[in-house]
């Protein structure tokens, strides 16, 4: 018996974006299904960050369209993205250090409760924390938290807003091994609940371990699309750099260095 095909949660169709002297995205197609992790790979300057900035409303595409849950959407700002159910966890966390976790969540809620009454916010935060295993003290000031706890606070802030699609930019870059394991448990729970995840990472072993789909960008274009069971780290590295490689310590180091440079 054949199963019905799953309708995409997100379709970015023929997205192009030019900056002075560089074509950051050149007719890029990118699709995310509900309940899946779709990883986006590429070297420094490949166009990953630009594509995700377009999706999150941080810049506008020159051409192409974005379709979310079957409808074409115009995403002109991060608040627009959030209103559609699209959230983003940045590599450098976007939290106010002198406010508590709960107060950071309350920022930008449009005065539904206001910071003067945190009880409804804390109640729901506790529910979301328990559901996804995101343990963090909601009354702690952000500056008092460890890096892994700050990331959990960022994820809680997005989930509080009922996001359906979450972009994670290099989420394991500053985490310990145990924190990475905990994060992966949370991400799998999110996909089990039907949420779509976009993972930007240069750690190929993590991409293969966590992803359902993998898209590779090179020089602003899609150089390949595959699934973990159909590929290897060597093949992914070749799609990234455009030449045959053997995944040695040298190649891993080169890819790691690229992720730390300024990205387009």
Language-model segments: which ranges?
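Glycine-rich phosphate-binding loops of nucleotide-dependent enzymes
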Residues: 2-263
């Amino acid at each position: 018996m054949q199963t019905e095909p799953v309708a995409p949660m997100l379709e970015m169709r023929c997205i192009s974006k030019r900056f002075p002297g560089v074509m950051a995205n050149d007719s890029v197609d990118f699709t995310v299904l509900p309940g899946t992790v779709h990883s986006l790979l590429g070297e420094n300057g490949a166009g990953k960050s630009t594509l995700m900035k377009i999706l999150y409303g941080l810049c506008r595409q020159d051409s192409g369209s974005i379709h979310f849950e079957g409808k074409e959407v115009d995403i002109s700002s991060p608040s627009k993205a959030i209103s559609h159910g699209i959230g983003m966890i940045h590599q450098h966390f976007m939290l106010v250090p002198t406010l508590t976790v709960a107060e950071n969540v309350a920022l930008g809620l449009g005065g539904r409760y206001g910071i003067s009454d945190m009880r409804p916010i804390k109640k729901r935060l506790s529910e979301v924390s328990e559901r996804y295993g995101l343990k963090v003290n909601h009354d702690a000031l952000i500056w008092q938290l460890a890096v892994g706890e700050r990331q959990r606070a960022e994820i809680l802030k997005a989930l509080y807003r009922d996001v359906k699609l979450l972009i994670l930019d290099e989420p394991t870059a500053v985490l310990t091994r145990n924190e990475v394991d905990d994060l992966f448990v949370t991400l799998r729970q999110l996909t089990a609940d039907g949420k779509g995840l976009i993972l930007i990472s240069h750690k190929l072993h993590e991409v293969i371990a966590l992803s359902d789909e993998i898209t590779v960008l090179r020089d602003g274009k899609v150089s390949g699309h595959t699934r973990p069971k159909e590929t290897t780290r060597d093949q992914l590295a070749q799609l990234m750099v455009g030449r045959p490689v053997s995944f040695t310590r040298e190649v891993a180091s080169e890819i790691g260095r690229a992720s730390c440079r300024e990205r387009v």
